[in-house]
Amino acid sequence: MSDSKEDIRNGQEEDDLFSENEDNHTSQQDELINGHIENDSETAVSDDGLFSNTEEATEAPEADVPVKKVLEVAVPNFKSPASASNDVFHAHIPNFLSVEQTPYDPEQYAAEAEADAALLEHDAHWGQRIKHKVDNTVRWRLGPSGSYQSNAQIVQWSDGSYSLRIGNDIYDTQNKLISQPTFVTASHEAQHLLRVQTSFKSSFTFLPSAINTATRSKLPSMRLTTVQVPSRSVQEIIIEKDPELLKRQAEKYEEERSRARRRLEKRKQLNNYQNGTGEEEEDYSSFYGPRSTYSEQNEIIDSDRMDRLKRIKQEGAGQYRGYNKDLEENEEDDLGDFIAEEEEEEEQEEEQEEDEEDEEEVGAGSDIKGFDADKEASVARATINKYEDDEVIPSAVETDRSETVTETSVGDGSVQRRVKRRIVESDSE
């Protein structure tokens, strides 16, 4: 039967909540104590029925076994939660059911009803909680004869299945045997003892009944007892630029930086190679020479490596942590200057190559003209001698230009050509 606060106010709640006819059916109305519905007890077996008279006659009499007293204490005799003729079940209470652990008191129930009515005037949602508290709460009390009475019952059907009835609502149950030994004990804290009263054989799990539409309609209100997990709201982010475009630009910028850094490293290696301090010009004969020379070269190489590693670490720390912004700006300036220098050097190399090509063309032509120039020079000298012998003075100054080509060898084995121009003059006296 269901609970009702109006029945309490009219003084009729006891007849509706706990029926007087339930006293005759104690085997089906044993209540839940301390949060669990327990209806089980071990069958008491008397010592007189352990052995028959024939067994006593055939077996030899046992010798007296000495009994040693270990401890003697006086403890209160707590009543077992279930009678010896019933079974005790362990129940898992779901979130849509609740159990009142204290005995039912009409006066206290009426006071709680008045407090709930006052809260209902300020909060309309409080009515759902009141309805859940009234309809889905297991209560118990002590009857006039001292037996336990409850508004909840475990019903066993003809097919062996079980159901839980609370008032007018029916709930399905799932029965499962307990594999591990589980016992109900009474605690005596003063004597530091635990007294075993009974054991559990099976456990129950309660579910809403599929045939009870009224119960199914109450499920939304039943969920109010669950813990509400706070959900995170959706975060809104305003994007002014295309993130994919920014990503591509950043990747392109990193590629340019890496390319410029590699070119700078190659330039440094080339300078070291030209200055004789690079690893490419390492003199392998130093392995067989004095130890001091080998140590000095190793120190130079190690110091260069340490400086390079230190610089790389500083660049990486400034790039990923953002602590060395000034270092990155200086590095960008150095990279920009280096790129400009590289472009100027490339232009100078191109101009030098063009000049060399022009000189080669001029040198090829001057080889042919050299012989004619020598011939003309000899003719001019002969003419001057003739004029001196004949004492004939020319009236004009004759000037002749001749070009000769000289070849000089360079240390690297290449031949460098130079064009020399010679002017032959004759003056009149």
From Swiss-Prot:
**Biological process terms in GO annotation:** heterochromatin boundary formation; heterochromatin organization; positive regulation of transcription elongation by RNA polymerase II; transcription elongation by RNA polymerase II
Q: Keywords of this protein's UniProt record, alphabetized?
A: Nucleus
Q: Where is the composition biased (Acidic residues)?
A: 328-362
Q: Where found in the cell?
A: Nucleus
**Recorded GO terms, molecular function?**
RNA binding; RNA polymerase II C-terminal domain phosphoserine binding
The organism's superkingdom is given as Eukaryota
Biased segments, Basic and acidic residues type: 1-12, 369-378
Concerning InterPro entries, the annotation shows:
Leo1 (IPR007149)
Q: Where is this region: Disordered?
A: 1-63, 257-306, 320-429
Instruction: Give a GO cellular-component term.
Output: nucleus
Member of which family? Belongs to the LEO1 family.
What name goes with this protein? Uncharacterized protein C13E7.08c
Which species is this record about?
Schizosaccharomyces pombe (strain 972 / ATCC 24843) (Fission yeast)
